[in-house]
């Protein structure tokens, strides 16, 4: 085994260790405290995030510009061209499908860098922002070449590494459209000081709010460092730098998955009061009493200190409903997206990171394209949502065209000393073909469902897919339903082969999609598909796990766990409930009597209270449960069970809990991964069985 292959094997095994044990990363960081910057020979074998690992540990000190590569493309000594390297084959799917970057010709050359938004995620590889920008500039300026170096999953250190190579391309300008992946590691990091300070704050009143402030200050420093590095390697080399400040889906995206709450640990009475205030506000919002909802939810926010995405999101919706307070609604919804949570890593630019890009970029001489301002001005809507975004941060075709138009308007005077009206540049921006737009919405529907978004938003994207391209409604929608409804891994189902024959679908489903069907619950995805296309309801959404054909169903199996379930992040012998209701969907072959067995507890409850079960909205039993594990069994008559989809709900009591912050602090200071959200119940066992 040669040296590079050996290193690759070690890197792969080390990556597996990091995935299995978060403390291994902290150990690595401790060992790297005195690390020196690696030279080109030392880092040549790394790829993607690993390519930046030495730079990360060394904090970008003394990194020399690479002499023989631009991202995944390496110089061909015979021709001088940059050729896609075989050793980076694992990254090809994240980059432009370009085999060779030739020598610069007579046209002006722009290097286009960024993350998945800059790649045109959901449209990739058929419709790319770099292609749109090239056509716009060529139409109203002179013929140009835009070299697409954008890479999905690109971290800030790898971005700086690629930017440092742009002088090799003789670029006339560099555009960096990034910021959504600029984030920190786990809570403490590597140094002892954060363990002491953060540990004290975990136990303090409103300590989590102060921890969040500390994390945001660290993000400020990170963003300033990255922007400074980008300016050093571009402006420092005499190349104009354009920084595109990203925007996110403020109106429609929710960071806290539907049906859950992210309540930080509070005192016993405060947790109870928080839940009461939240429930009151939710009911007021449902009846469109927006001012009342605002008043109620502010009580909850006063208790959590602004560290709950759920409470901030509800406040933002209440402000939005009042109509006259859109600026307040924007700031509040934006704040809800910026709550840092290790178990909910949503690619999106933090508001303070965007501010730092603007400020430091301008100070260093970069030209700023401010997409939040552009989107608000061009759409007349201060709350960008599904019109411009397909998920948390990736754009619709309109969003792409507006972003590249603003970028082109900035580049024209830099490259050609001329200006052009925004509308003229927008008119020159090509649109995707209707089939491409349909596929983008179809994949977005899958993605939103997997990320715990509300059913209405997922159904919206599926309907948009069918309207954009009716042939998708005829074939691809059914293929998605068939691929994801069975026990078999989707990639082994014939329908999946048909889906991935489309290049857009292949890029997402094979490159990014979750392929293991049995690993998590697909009921929300299948329900959203059926809502958009009711004819699908004729087919069972769970043919391999049907009660009646199987004698027993274990509802705590991964098959009934959402992809974004926080429980997946922790090694424990129970499933925690993060809301006062836990819902489970199952399919029954026919109405017949069944038995429900469960073992549960209300952790740290001061006293026992009523746990109630409902099946399809009908009460089927209740019992008192406290802090001790309690085993229960309920017999359900046949008339309560329906043929097809059934909904089991368990409602947990809102009782006072002992304050667990002192224990969390001890666990944290001992190096354990701690769960900083309130558990309303623990489930150790939950099965359904047909009556004997």
Model-found features: residue ranges?
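Noncatalytic modules at the cell exterior or secretory-pathway interfaces
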Residues: 638-651
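A short beta-strand element within beta-rich, extracytoplasmic domains
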Residues: 590-605, 609
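Extracellular and analogous surface-interaction loops
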Residues: 582-594, 635-641
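Membrane-embedded segments
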Residues: 104-170
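Short, surface-exposed beta-strand/strand-loop-strand elements in extracellular ectodomains
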Residues: 608-618
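Extracellular carbohydrate recognition and processing domains
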Residues: 620-640
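N-terminal secretory targeting modules
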Residues: 1-110, 123-124, 138, 142, ...
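Long, contiguous interaction/recruitment modules in multidomain scaffold/adaptor proteins
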Residues: 169, 173-272, 353-433, 490-491, ...
């Amino acid at each position: 085994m040669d040296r590079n292959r050996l290193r690759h094997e070690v890197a792969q095994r080390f990556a597996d260790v990091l995935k299995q044990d978060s403390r291994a990363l902290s150990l690595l960081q401790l060992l790297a405290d005195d690390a020196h910057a690696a030279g080109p020979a030392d880092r040549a074998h790394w790829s993607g995030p690993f390519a930046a690992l030495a730079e990360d540990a060394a904090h970008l000190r003394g990194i020399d510009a690479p002499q023989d590569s631009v991202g995944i493309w390496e110089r061909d000594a015979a021709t001088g061209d940059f050729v896609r390297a075989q050793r980076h084959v694992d990254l090809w799917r994240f980059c432009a499908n370009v085999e060779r970057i030739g020598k610069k010709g007579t046209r002006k050359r722009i290097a286009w860098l960024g993350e998945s938004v800059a790649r045109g995620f959901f449209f990739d590889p058929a419709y790319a922002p770099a292609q749109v920008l090239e056509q716009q500039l060529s139409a109203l300026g002179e013929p140009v070449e835009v070299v697409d170096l954008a890479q999905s999953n690109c971290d800030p250190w790898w971005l700086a590494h690629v930017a440092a190579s742009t002088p090799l391309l003789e670029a006339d300008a560099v555009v960096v459209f990034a910021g959504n992946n600029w984030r920190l590691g786990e809570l403490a990091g590597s140094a002892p000081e954060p363990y002491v300070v953060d540990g004290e704050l975990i136990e303090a009143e409103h300590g989590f709010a102060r921890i969040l402030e500390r994390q945001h200050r660290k993000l400020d420093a990170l963003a300033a460092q990255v922007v400074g590095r980008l300016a050093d390697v571009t402006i420092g080399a005499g190349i104009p730098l354009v920084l595109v400040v990203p925007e996110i889906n403020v109106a429609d995206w929710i960071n806290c998955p539907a049906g859950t709450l992210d309540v930080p640990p509070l005192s016993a009475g405060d947790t109870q009061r928080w839940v009461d205030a939240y429930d009151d506000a939710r009911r007021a919002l449902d009846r469109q009493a927006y001012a009342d909802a605002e008043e109620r939810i502010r009580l909850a926010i006063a208790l959590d200190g602004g560290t709950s995405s759920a409470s901030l999101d509800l406040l933002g919706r209440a402000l939005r409903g009042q109509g006259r307070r859109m600026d307040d609604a924007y700031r509040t919804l934006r704040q809800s997206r910026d709550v840092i949570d290790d178990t909910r890593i949503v690619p999106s630019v933090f508001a303070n990171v965007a501010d730092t890009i603007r400020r430091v970029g301008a100070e260093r001489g970069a030209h700023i394209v401010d997409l939040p301002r552009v989107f608000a001005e061009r759409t007349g809507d201060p709350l960008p949502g599904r019109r411009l975004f397909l998920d948390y941060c990736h754009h619709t075709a309109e969003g792409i065209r507006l972003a590249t138009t603003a970028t082109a308007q900035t580049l024209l005077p830099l490259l050609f000393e001329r200006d052009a009206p925004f509308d003229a540049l927008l008119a020159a921006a090509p649109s995707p073909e209707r089939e491409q737009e349909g596929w983008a919405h179809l994949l977005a529907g899958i993605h939103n469902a997997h990320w715990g978004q509300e059913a209405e938003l997922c159904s919206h994207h599926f309907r948009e897919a069918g309207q954009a391209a009716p042939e998708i409604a005829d074939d691809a929608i059914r293929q998605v339903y068939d691929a994801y409804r069975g026990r078999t891994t989707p990639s082994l189902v014939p329908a999946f082969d048909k889906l991935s024959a489309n290049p857009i679908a292949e890029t997402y489903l094979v490159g990014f999609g979750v392929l293991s069907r049995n690993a998590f619950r697909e009921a929300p995805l299948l329900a959203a598909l059926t809502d958009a296309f009711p004819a699908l309801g004729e087919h069972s959404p769970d043919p391999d796990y049907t009660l009646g054909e199987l004698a027993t169903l274990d509802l705590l199996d991964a098959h009934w766990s959402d992809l974004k379930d926080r429980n997946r992040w922790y090694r424990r012998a129970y499933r925690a409930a993060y809301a006062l209701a836990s819902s489970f969907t199952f399919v029954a072959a026919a109405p017949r009597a069944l038995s429900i067995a469960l073992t549960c507890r209300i952790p740290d409850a001061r006293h026992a209270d009523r746990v109630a079960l409902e099946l399809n909205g009908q009460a089927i039993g209740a019992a008192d449960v406290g802090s001790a594990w309690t085993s229960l069994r309920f017999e359900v008559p046949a008339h309560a069970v329906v043929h097809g989809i059934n909904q089991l709900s368990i409602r947990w009591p809102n009782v006072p809990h002992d304050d667990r912050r002192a224990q969390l602090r001890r666990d944290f200071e001992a190096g354990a991964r701690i769960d900083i959200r309130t558990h309303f119940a623990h489930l150790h066992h939950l099965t359904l069985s047909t009556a004997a």
